[in-house]
């Protein structure tokens, strides 16, 4: 590692942490899943979120190393698909019915993977971290991969904070189920709107 890269790592770490800890589709879904049905189903979904995060990071690194035109061509479709999925999750939270999860949406490993790979914010965040803080200072693929895969590790750890935060909010949720569902659904809908706004 070059001295310039070492000097850039604290800013990279701060950027990654801030992006990972703030509300987004994965963090909001994890919080809502924990509040609604408990930590065990949320942890099952978290495994999928983590797998999806690593997949997205691998795609970001591949795009930055040469497949950029392929990724750029797929971004609009991925954005629309991701926004549609997040809107569907929001609707699932507030529609009538008492299903498990989000009224029938099961918090599975597969659901976690789908949420992450359609989360274009995640692809943009991952790419930005590499472009701003790593690629200007090294062309070593091993260093790029090592630092790049730190992003999903930090992101997954931050997602766990949202899951365990939900544990402490379960009693509150049980007393205020409808308003909390409405607020969480609105937050997810805002995430979807933000995703679509990036297309304009």
Report the location of each language-model feature.
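Juxtamembrane transmembrane-helix termini in multi-pass membrane transport proteins
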Residues: 3-73, 128-147
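Membrane helix-loop-helix hairpins that form the core translocation module of multi-pass transporters
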Residues: 40-110, 165, 172, 193
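Alpha-helical multi-pass membrane helix bundles of inner-membrane/thylakoid proteins
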Residues: 2-5, 76-77, 88-127, 168-186, ...
């Amino acid at each position: 590692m070059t001295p310039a890269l070492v000097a850039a790592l604290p800013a990279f770490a701060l950027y990654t942490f801030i992006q990972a800890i703030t509300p987004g589709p994965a963090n909001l879904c994890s919080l809502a899943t924990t509040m609604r049905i408990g930590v065990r189903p949320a942890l099952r979904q978290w495994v999928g979120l983590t797998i999806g995060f690593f997949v997205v990071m691998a795609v970001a690194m591949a795009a930055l190393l040469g497949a950029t035109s392929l990724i750029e061509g797929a971004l609009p479709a991925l954005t629309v698909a991701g926004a549609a999925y997040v809107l569907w999750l929001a609707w699932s939270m507030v529609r009538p019915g008492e299903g498990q999860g989000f009224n029938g949406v099961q918090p599975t490993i597969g659901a976690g993977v789908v949420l992450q790979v359609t989360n274009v914010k995640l692809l943009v965040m991952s790419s930005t971290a590499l472009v701003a803080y790593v690629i200007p200072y090294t062309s070593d693929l091993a260093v790029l991969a090592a630092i790049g895969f730190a992003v999903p590790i930090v992101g997954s750890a931050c997602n766990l904070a949202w899951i365990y935060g939900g544990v402490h909010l379960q009693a509150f949720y049980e007393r205020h189920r409808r308003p909390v569902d409405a607020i969480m659904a609105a937050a997810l809908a805002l995430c979807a709107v933000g995703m679509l706004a990036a297309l304009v």
